[in-house]
Every structure is written in structure tokens, then in C-alpha cells.
Regions:
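Residue-level signal for inorganic ion chemistry
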Residues: 2, 52, 78, 104, ...
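Short histidine-centered loop motifs in beta-beta connectors
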Residues: 105, 111-119
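Short beta-strand micro-motifs in enzyme catalytic cores
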Residues: 76, 114-116, 163
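A structural micro-motif recognizing beta-strand termini
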Residues: 81, 118-121
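RNA pseudouridine synthases
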Residues: 1-101, 184-193
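Pseudouridine synthases involved in rRNA/tRNA modification
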Residues: 108-111, 125, 131-195
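A residue-level detector for short acidic-glycine micro-motifs
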Residues: 42, 82, 106-108, 167
Length: 195
């Protein structure tokens, strides 16, 4: 599924009911589906891009296990404030006391920001956002881990897009290579970044 920005994957404790999962299950039931779709991982509300859903709980458990064993390759596109000193590297800083590692490579440098390919090898909550903040280059649009007033570039949301997922299917053993284009709002930002 290519998740749009602005939707949660699952409900929060605030009981927000309209989530990507609820919308998908309503749609599938209206088409006569006899199963529920279950998310195999999560993306932040503001993050757009690929998310895997499974048909039923047993399929979900198999995919979740692949994530746990780090057998799924994930790649994101991020826009980071300013320009990174190292154009390629690995950030290995703990997140909430747990080991976390994020590989990155600058794909293109714009006037006030870098476009970065990001490959987390662990899946801590907000890992990418925290790691780039710690480098002194928070994501463009960041409000939770940086003060927007401290940075020249503004965006309506965090500029982070889940672009690639690669893994071996747990049942068929076939190679699965998923990708999706950059979200339209991020494409628009690239064409006309705010002053």
C-alpha cells in the first residue's frame, strides 16, 4: 500500500478511528472480502510511502518476523536541513536506550537542503527523525524533534517517504521488490521550495 501523509496506520490511545487500516478494511469488506488486512509495520502519521498489509493474522506474523530478523530491506527518501558533512555514512546512536543504526547517502544537494537515501537497519520509533536531528540536520518540516524557527526551510509536514521494501516472501520464497514514487507534495516541494 502507498500510504498518504496525514493518516495513522492504527488507532492511538486518543481513540482516533479513521486510520489507514480502518479505511482499507471498510473498502475490502464493501467488495466482499472475508478477511481483514493487518499492518505488518508502522509509519508515522506524516510519513508517506510503502507499508505492507497481510491478509489475516497468520500472514501478518510471518511478515512481522521477517522485520524482527532484519530480513526486509527498507529505504526512505528524506529531505534534511542544510548540507551533511559526510555524503555517506552510518549513524549508530541509541534511540530510547536501544541500539539503532541508520545508513544514509546524499543523492542530491539543493540550495538549503540535501536529498538523502536512508536505510535503517533497525526499526525504532522515530529513528530516522531522531538520528538526523542528532547530526544537526533535522528533516525539513520537523516539529517534534527540532524547533522550526531555528531553520530556514519550512514544510507542511516532515519530508520523509518510505520508497523501497525488499524481502523474500515467507510462503512462496519469491523475491519481492516493492517501490513507489515520491509523494506528490514532496515532488511539488522540490520544484518550488518555500523561501
Amino acid at each position: 500500500m502507498d500510504k498518504p501523509t496525514g493518516l495513522l496506520v492504527i488507532p492511538t490511545p486518543k481513540k482516533e478511528k479513521r486510520t489507514l487500516t480502518s479505511i482499507l478494511n471498510e473498502e475490502f469488506k464493501s467488495r466482499g472480502a472475508e478477511y481483514n488486512l493487518h499492518p505488518c509495520h508502522r509509519l508515522d502519521r506524516e510519513t508517506s510511502g510503502l507499508i505492507i498489509y497481510a491478509k489475516g493474522k497468520s500472514a501478518q506474523k510471518k511478515i512481522v518476523e521477517l522485520f524482527r530478523q532484519k530480513k526486509i530491506i527498507k529505504a526512505y527518501t528524506a529531505f534534511v536541513q542544510g548540507h551533511l558533512k559526510e555524503h555517506k555514512g552510518i549513524i549508530k546512536n541509541p534511540v530510547e536506550g536501544q541500539n539503532a543504526a541508520t545508513s544514509y547517502e546524499v543523492i542530491e544537494s539543493k540550495k538549503d537542503f540535501d536529498i538523502v537515501k536512508v536505510m535503517p537497519s533497525t526499526g525504532r520509533t522515530n529513528q530516522i527523525r531522531i538520528h538526523f536531528k542528532e547530526l544537526g540536520h533535522p528533516l525539513v518540516g520537523e516539529r517534534k524533534f527540532a524547533f522550526r524557527k531555528d531553520y530556514k526551510l519550512k514544510a507542511k509536514r516532515v519530508c520523509l517517504h518510505a520508497e523501497i521494501l525488499r524481502f523474500t516472501h515467507p510462503v512462496t520464497n519469491e523475491a519481492v521488490d516493492l517501490s513507489c514514487a515520491l509523494a506528490q507534495d514532496l515532488e511539488k516541494f522540490l520544484k518550488t521550495p518555500p523561501d
